[in-house]
Amino acid sequence: MKHIKNEREEVFLEDDQAQHSQAELLSSKDENLQPSIPLSPVAFELDFSGNFQFISDNSSELLDIPKDKIIGHSVAEVLGTDGYNAFMRAVNCLLKDDSHSYHVRFQHSINANHANQNYYTAKGDLPSDEKITKPFDAIGILIRHPGSAIPAHTMWVVNPATNSLGSVSPLVTKLLDVIGFGASLLDKYLCDLRTSYHKHNSLDALPLPTPEFCQICEREIQSWFFELHSKFCLSTSTYESVVQAAQDSLLYFRSTLLEIQEGMQKDSSLVPVYKNEPLIVDADDYFFTDENKQTLSLCSFLSQVMYYLEVAIDITIPPVKIIVNFDKVDSLRVQSPRSEKATIELDNYNPSLENCSSAVIALWEDIKTAVDTKITGVLRLRNAIYYSERIRLEIDHHVQEIIDDVVSNLVTNHSSTSLGHLESKLAPSITFPDACDALEAEECITRPGSATNTPQSDRSLDINDLSRSSSYSRHLSHVSLSNPDFAIGSPMSQDSSNYSSPLHRRKASDSNFSDPRFDDLKYLSPNSSPRFVASDGPNRPASNGRSSLFSRGRASNLGDVGLRLPSPSPRIHTIVPNSAPEHPSINDYKILKPISKGAFGSVYLAQKRTTGDYFAIKILKKSNMIAKNQVINVRAERAILMSQGESPFVAKLYYTFQSKDYLYLVMEYLNGGDCGSLLKTMGVLDLDWIRTYIAETVLCLGDLHDRGIIHRDIKPENLLISQNGHLKLTDFGLSRVGYMKRHRRKQSSSIPVLDLRDRSSAISDLSLSTASSVLEAQSLITPERPKRPSLNEKLLSLDGTSIRLAGQSFNYENSAEDSPTATNTPTSQVDESNIFRSTDSPRVQPFFENKDPSKRFIGTPDYIAPEVILGNPGIKASDWWSLGCVVFEFLFGYPPFNAETPDQVFQNILARRINWPAEVFTAESSVALDLIDRLLCMNPANRLGANGVEEIKAHPFFKSVNWDTILEEDPPFVPKPFSPEDTVYFDSRGLKGFDFSEYYNQPTVTEAQKLEEERPASSIPQHVSGNRKGRLRSNTISTPEFGSFTYRNLDFLNKANRNTIQKLRKEHMAVKSAKTSVDDTFSQYMSRFKAKLSTSQSVGPVKSSRRASMADYEASTTTRVQDITTDSIDSIDDFDSLKEGRMLSFFDNLALEDHKGVSSTMSASQSQSSMHTALPDVTEGTSSDEHTTIQKGRIDNLQAQSLTHKRNAISYPGLFQLDRLQMIIPKDEIELAEILKKIFPKLTLVLIDDPWSILKKLLQNEQFNVVFLHFGNDKVSSSRLMYSVRTSATINSRVPFVYICEDETCIPTDLQSDGVLLKPITCENIESCLRKLDVWHS
């Protein structure tokens, strides 16, 4: 393995020509080996002997080396002698001076087949037996032990060697290996500085750096640092989620043990059970002495455990409140001294377990595993934060030096006044506040003295330090710890080190400039992390200047402490600390309108204030969830949705958070409604529709079953229609755990007991192996409530939860019968429904026999399988039964076991009394009937699908289905909303006119429940007192029932950041090649278009704003046909009266294909050439990628449309005057339109071909007099259309339908129509037809 020498002086001290040559070489050297998408970097730790003591799990992905072949091995064994020598030189340098980061470039051989799979090759795959030698960059820092500051190890992060896009100036070449492509963006900014100065000949006109919006931390980041920051941000957010999940687990432990103590105080005869063994044996039964009784007392043991848990819970990662000078970067601290002391105390804490039973030992080992998981996560998080801060500070420092050099060169010919200003000293030092916001006064770390009593060069605080406090994320969410997706880079020095060396930094006084505008700057503090830190911060004010989640925006104003321009050189601020709220809140969203109401919560359409993205927010009231015993349901649904983040079959979950009284699940907004609403509108579905929808549902359920998830609530209302027309499953509240065992609460009037079903069944299962790992809820079977335990049989059970953290499992044993993977789950024989166990607990009763309201089924019973009703454990076959009920309802319009009461429905299900319709079945439907019959088999073992999903796929009903491409085929229905805020396809189910202020007035959990200040771990009392119990309750940051309930879908946020990076690259390349971007071309065309309209009459602007949602980004390869409607209006000035909310066409969703399904209208003076689709205006500053769907052919089509008629303009629903006659006709019936306009001079015609557009038009509050149809509309039969309109409650429910055809005999006799218009179309035929309909005097 050949090691490339790293003498940074060879890079930095070459002449300009050599610099450009080297940059060009780097840009072309590995052209065929550059990753097409960013690969996750690898983080590892080296001891001072060069041995790996930690490496992230993605080592095999990037380096093609398994993790188990690295840990404990020497660098020489993995990277060869050259690699070992290089890293050891860097390690020795760090031990001597750790104020610098060190860079090592090495080469490593990768199997070609592995490289092909991981996108290393851009131009064809290489032979699988060939080796590829690829350069890598590693940058490391020294990590010290907390508290003692003794060197512990070195931390390194490895990335593929990067390069800029094209050559860069010598000034930024030294940053090339660090920020890669960002060096090109920095070089461009320096060019902008020079251009602006030469243009205005003034320092006051120098431009500010243009920031980019990080979707993870929601902050504005400099473009050249954005790619590196996004990796830092993702890595720290990953660790935060790990630590938060571990914190939740410890809180569950603590709450459980506390209630056990309370229960034992009220009834001392209770004996605990852990893993089916007595936790503390009865001393009398085992002839223990009095001394041993005291040693083995439960209270004493629990007190020790509570003390241990409390110390672990009190460990926090406080916010980085310290503003440090770069020369004092080693003073940066990211953890409070008390937390550091607590960590050391836990390491040395070993309680005496002598003479303890195996259950006691097992309990202690499980708790210790959870504690160790948190400690490990905290240490990793602390190191990641420290690492990212160190690298950011170095980059900021060197970038500022570069900017100062450029400005200094610009003003060399200026007056002596300017020169004198350039030579001014440091910016004013910052005055610190008297106390920190979140840390206790005694925890505030001693800072360097002010500039008044220390030398400026090393004690004063530079103004740049305002931005150098933290780059880590404010949110908690779930991503893998072991795949920290962050790249490292740092400038090096002109040191004589052979392989690695730091870059000497000039003193800050050499290049910093004072600015009186910064004299009164307030102290900045970034946000706390992780979420359980006891600190409060103000929420971010609403801002409309930021970009949409997947479209990069340009914020011109970053606030009072944002990017401001001290004179003469611009000051960079990589992070704007106050730009993100500390705690997610519903105030971050604008609730627009209700979508639907369910049994336990409501769903609303909302828009995120910072980005403009649209989401569906499910809001649940905590008190209702607890009262209705839905705690486990909520936690299970959240966990499942988190685990299905990449599934194309499940509605995506993006965020979860809570307030004092409510839970919020921010989900993907699927604007097509649900199949329940579709059925309500259509009545029944065609067989082709049924086949497609059921096939997609089969794929979805098969995928869930393969993952060990049983949905158990399959019904039309839970099948959502996405933007592209395909189905997605939602509402997993009843999944895994079953139905009836979730709807019972303990009814006890004596001893208060702990219901583990509400507390401990859904504790997170953390997988730390990949960045996409998620929290998996562990199931819990809860049998019927036991009777009051007898005196000798009272057992207090902790069993009921399985927790897996950091790959190490400890179990509160859970039953395997309802586990997602029963074969891998330990089985417990104890009753898990209660902490009390009795040997005479009753058997489970069927639902319909239960008279206790607390044990009756809550929800829709029509789709429940008979085995579930009988109380048997749920199996996968129960989902297939529900699917059979859905097929029946799709075909006939009602459930197969429908009855007036739930009890009757249950009786029908158990007796298999299917309510078949009386009509005669066709041969075509007989196959569907056979599918229903086999799915509704009473014996689960014989039910279709019991042996796997392939059984269902092989059924003749799906003979024409291509299972491999069904999700890529055109669906039967594609939603065409009028606007992004249109919810026309949803059935609100009574949720109307709700006052949203009830949600906005809710305080956050932290605001509602202030935590006590952090106490030294050593001060924790050894025994639990009454006051301590109360404090334990109040110190919980969130209700124990729901945990922290904080989650962010980092996978999608990271994709958004990567999308921004790709846009930056494309835009930079477009500028370099001097090509006109798509949006510039389109803007020019639109300007000509509007100019032509204005020659006739002035036209008011039609506003347009792009709000791309996550669903739009996910389905970016799919174009959606929009319902673009143009209606007749009297004057083009009516443009001014159009409302933006009724905009029917917005650019990011314009279709590329022909105007199928697009409706048009004609006024009295219009002809065929005048019919066209007018377009709204385009706001300036739109990114070119927003219009990637608008191809050249599309623009040509738009230009070809006629612009010659003065009265031709866009019209919108609601502008019709109801005193006029209105008709709908096919848009190709121009002859019919002209004749009708002659007959009815005041007639308004709406030209629509698409049946769905016709249906949507008729279902609005806009009256039509006649609907002309071509017989045999595609996909939706005429009878279906008529049925939907006739059964609706709109003003068009009795509108006449007239079919246009060549011969009246082609109309089936059983088709009920109001009239037939025969061709050729003449005035006489139309008059005859309409007279029969009595339309003349309408």
From Swiss-Prot:
ATP binds at I595, S596, K597, G598, A599, F600, G601, S602, V603, K618. The modification Phosphoserine is found at S525, S748, S1211. Residues 589-958 form the Protein kinase domain. Residues 484-554, 813-844, 1010-1035, 1159-1185 are annotated as: Disordered. Residues 491-501, 541-550, 813-842 have a biased composition (Polar residues). Its EC number is 2.7.11.1. SUPFAM superfamilies: Protein kinase-like (PK-like). Residues 1159-1174 have a biased composition (Low complexity). InterPro entries: AGC-kinase_C, Kinase-like_dom_sf, PAS, Prot_kinase_dom, Ser/Thr_kinase_AS, Ser_Thr_kinase_AGC. Residues 28-98 form the PAS domain. Belongs to the protein kinase superfamily. Ser/Thr protein kinase family. This is Serine/threonine-protein kinase cek1. It comes from Schizosaccharomyces pombe (strain 972 / ATCC 24843) (Fission yeast). The lineage of its organism: Eukaryota, Fungi, Dikarya, Ascomycota, Taphrinomycotina. The gene is cek1.
